[in-house]
Amino acid sequence: MAVPKKRTSKAKKNARKANWKNQAKTEAQKALSLAKSVLTGKSNGFVYNTLEVADAIVE
């Protein structure tokens, strides 16, 4: 079984964690932007029944 030989430094650990958090932040911003676009009706890349969407928003 593979075992690390030395302890990972704090700097490397923090850099990896910061990278992971930045990726998550970017994905969250994309999801929020997409949701806003769909709700305002300005998105052209989706094909859906507008009555179903309106009913879902009202409920």
UniProtKB/Swiss-Prot annotation:
Location within or outside the cell: Plastid, Chloroplast
Entry's transmembrane regions: none
Pfam families to which the protein is assigned, alphabetical: Ribosomal_L32p
Signal peptide residues on this chain, from the entry's feature table: none
Region spans: Disordered: 1-24
Taxonomic superkingdom: Eukaryota
GO molecular function: structural constituent of ribosome
Basic residues composition bias: residue spans: 1-19
Any single GO BP term: translation
Keywords: Chloroplast, Plastid, Ribonucleoprotein, Ribosomal protein
Any one Gene Ontology cellular component term annotated for this protein: chloroplast
Family the entry assigns: Belongs to the bacterial ribosomal protein bL32 family.
Protein name: Large ribosomal subunit protein bL32c
Species annotation: Porphyra purpurea
Lineage of source species: Eukaryota, Rhodophyta, Bangiophyceae, Bangiales, Bangiaceae
